[in-house]
Amino acid sequence: MMNALELQALRRIFDMTIEECTIYITQDNNSATWQRWEAGDIPISPEIIARLKEMKVRRQRRINAIVDKINNRIGNNTMRYFPDLSSFQSIYTEGDFIEWKIYQSVAAELFAHDLERLC
């Protein structure tokens, strides 16, 4: 189960517009439905809840892995921040839009807590 506020929060954590969510998460380009979910007018599709929860899990795994490296003093506590998808894919050639958004969300979170510097 997920409510409208949780849906909005996750969209914002991943820095995605409603339009991007309808392209890359629902894959139906139906902004009106997403807006109705965020307004609490209709129940959120279980498939969409599952996709968002999986994105959240992947994000947390990345955060945990980086924090473990920091705690073990591996690396220099600097993380790349990619301004666009093409720059992300130049390094992570198998990465897609969703992977980029997860990566960026992790980078921003760790930077906000002074755990990583961005480069």
Regions found by a protein language model. Give the residues of each.
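The alpha-helix within a helix-turn-helix
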Residues: 11, 22-23
